[in-house]
């Protein structure tokens, strides 16, 4: 290993340790781009992988993936031309009737999304949309509670990738629908906080269509040797702007043709 490779590997480990400690302590840290640079996506995913392996060794169960940066506007803001992804673990799932503690996620914000659950594996190097149609068992409305271990959300692309794509928690709705029962691209979304609209959008805001995002992810995961498997949940990306969370907030999301989902937060 060259001196440069050794230095890069050391930076990856330091960044992973920093984010791991932020998760453990509940105290946000400085941007990890200071260690791995602003443009080294390979290093950023290596950081994510270090902490993914830590989670698996600790007994956490991998249950799917989340897709981020599916908005073209956000991609331009961060200087990238593709989404990113992070891991979903079983202990990140919350139910609609469950009150979510505000400190369960650092600097929480919420996004409305469509979640897809697979009934078949998605592997192979030439996946198509038709493969998605066969593999997706159902879709449900979802609220993702994103968070950042980076102080004040001061992030660039490598920060968010390293930080498991700014993942936190998620809530799935209870109205599963088959793909043939609704149009995910045209589905309109409205999010309300305490009954007041705070975010809105449409499926097409998610990389042109949520299925485009899922296909991108499936291909990337297959190439990486970690394909999406039967039973995996995929959070396909935000349908509208994310909204900051305060104690006592109750968010209701309605997605046309798909149903609704609610996330309630404990008072501070």
UniProtKB/Swiss-Prot annotation:
E.C. number(s) listed in UniProt: 4.2.-.-
Pathway(s) per entry: Xenobiotic degradation; toluene degradation
PANTHER family for this protein: 2-KETO-4-PENTENOATE HYDRATASE (PTHR30143:SF0), ACID HYDRATASE (PTHR30143)
Family designation: Belongs to the hydratase/decarboxylase family.
Gene3D superfamilies cross-referenced by the UniProt entry: Fumarylacetoacetase-like, C-terminal domain
GO terms for biological process, alphabetical: toluene catabolic process
Keywords: Aromatic hydrocarbons catabolism, Lyase
UniProt-recorded name of the protein: TodF product hydratase
Any one GO CC term of the record: cytoplasm
MF terms in GO: 2-oxopent-4-enoate hydratase activity
Pfam families for this protein: FAA_hydrolase (PF01557)
Role according to the record: Converts the product of 2-hydroxy-6-oxo-2,4-heptadienoate hydrolase.
